[in-house]
From Swiss-Prot:
Lineage: Bacteria, Bacillati, Mycoplasmatota, Mycoplasmoidales, Metamycoplasmataceae
Assembly mode: Monomer.
Residues the record lists as binding GTP: 19-26, 81-85, 136-139
CDD domains per record: EF_Tu, EFTU_II, EFTU_III
Purpose of the protein: GTP hydrolase that promotes the GTP-dependent binding of aminoacyl-tRNA to the A-site of ribosomes during protein biosynthesis.
Name this protein carries in UniProt: Elongation factor Tu
Gene: tuf
């Protein structure tokens, strides 16, 4: 099968299907790809090829996810679908597959179920901006009751979105049957096109990483005799010009410096941008004043913090996690970008312990300040092995 060329002329958007088990997320994913393939905008994909999701690792955690890509008339989409509920939780918390928007699949025959609620909450916590709703399996209703039943479920789902801080009143809700569309029923194929149109119109194009303020996590530091100190790392976001000011943030008191040289692959550059692995020569910085785990950032755009709330997934024993629960006095290492920092945890909601496999919220207090902000991802480690993954939901101090 000829591979589709990656078309850079169309804006790129990352989306995913979320929702309760067996409500039809994977069938819908296959239906979108298949219906668009008839218009020459995608490769056709069957259910089995998506359901048989390959394993990938993110932050030391194994996650099963399927990635498919397709084009609408105006955009290029990367679409992620996960087979199991735990995979969704891990995927969203680790940011393995960033979502600019999500399609919430709800079986109209069941209405919202526990994981429907959990996925909406997770989407909110990890910063998914907008949700489009697909009410699935409407072909299961008799003709005379379909409209009423679908209307009731739609009201429920809109209420649920609003409850978790999404725009329940204005979110597009499309009702159809993923299975019928996949089987080639023209009426239901048209509904899939309607859904794609709703995603095109309602989910905003993400702000490109290069438009955000410059940030690079420091991976290594060395001295070049006669020239000064060089910090290397991958630029997380933004663009840096030669001779611009940056701040060294985290662990030690924040310090300002000027970047007098930018190198990549042994070549001198005038600028570094998101995605580059670069070496930055820093004016007037001693080798002892800077270390792995700090970040270089555009001045005043990020400050170090020691206390925050987080949403966390704790690995099961089978995933290489702990075999036993942990309690309030647990003090693991929190791994941010390039470094481990010890921290203490305080449970919310009156719980006494956290079991392997739990998805929980708690407050973390680090022993030294680290450059973090809402949405920053981290792993929790114990003796070098990953036992959990988290995302900062709220800064306390």
């Amino acid at each position: 099968m000829a591979k589709l060329d990656f078309d850079r002329s169309k804006p790129h958007v990352n989306i995913g299907t979320i929702g309760h088990v067996d409500h039809g997320k994977t069938t819908l994913t296959a239906a979108i790809a298949t219906v668009l393939s008839k218009k020459g905008l995608s490769e056709a994909r069957d259910y089995a090829s998506i359901d048989n999701a390959p394993e990938e690792k993110a932050r030391g955690i194994t996650i099963n996810t399927s990635h498919i890509e397709y084009n609408s008339e105006k955009r290029h989409y990367a679409h992620v679908d996960c087979p199991g509920h735990a995979d969704y939780v891990k995927n969203m918390i680790t940011g393995a597959a960033q979502m600019d928007g999500a399609i919430l699949v709800v079986a109209a025959t069941d209405g919202p179920m526990p994981q429907t609620r959990e996925h909406i909450l997770l989407a909110k916590q990890v910063g998914v901006p907008k949700i489009v709703v697909f009410l699935n399996k409407i072909d299961m209703f008799k003709d005379d009751e379909r409209e009423e039943m679908v209307g009731l479920v739609e009201m429920d789902v809109r209420g649920l979105l609003s409850e978790y801080g999404f725009d329940g009143d204005n979110a597009p809700v499309i009702a159809g049957s993923a299975l019928k569309a996949l089987q080639g029923d023209p009426k239901y194929e048209d509904i899939i096109m309607e859904l794609v149109q709703a995603v095109d119109d309602y989910i905003d194009e993400p702000k490109r990483e290069t438009d955000k303020p410059f940030l690079m996590a420091i991976e290594d530091v060395f001295t070049i005799t006669g020239r000064g100190t060089v910090a290397t790392g991958r630029v997380e976001r933004g663009v840096l010009q030669l001779n611009e000011e940056v701040e060294i943030v985290g662990i030690k008191p924040t310090k300002k410096t000027v970047v007098t040289g930018i190198e990549m692959f042994r070549k001198n550059l005038k600028q570094a941008q998101a995605g580059d692995n670069a070496g930055l020569l820093l004016r007037g910085v001693e080798r002892t004043e800077i270390e792995r785990g700090q970040v270089l950032a555009k001045p005043k755009t990020i400050i170090p913090h020691t206390e925050f709330e987080a949403t966390v997934y704790v690995l099961k024993k089978e995933e290489g996690g702990r075999h036993t629960p942990f309690f309030q006095n647990y003090k693991p290492q929190f791994y941010f970008r390039t470094t481990d920092v010890t921290g203490g945890i305080k449970f919310q909601d009156g719980r006494e312990m956290v079991m392997p496999g739990d998805n929980v919220q708690f407050t973390v207090t680090l022993i030294s300040p680290i450059a973090v902000e809402e949405g920053t991802k981290f792993s929790i480690r114990e003796g070098g092995r990953t036992v959990g993954a988290g995302s900062v939901t709220k800064i306390i101090k």
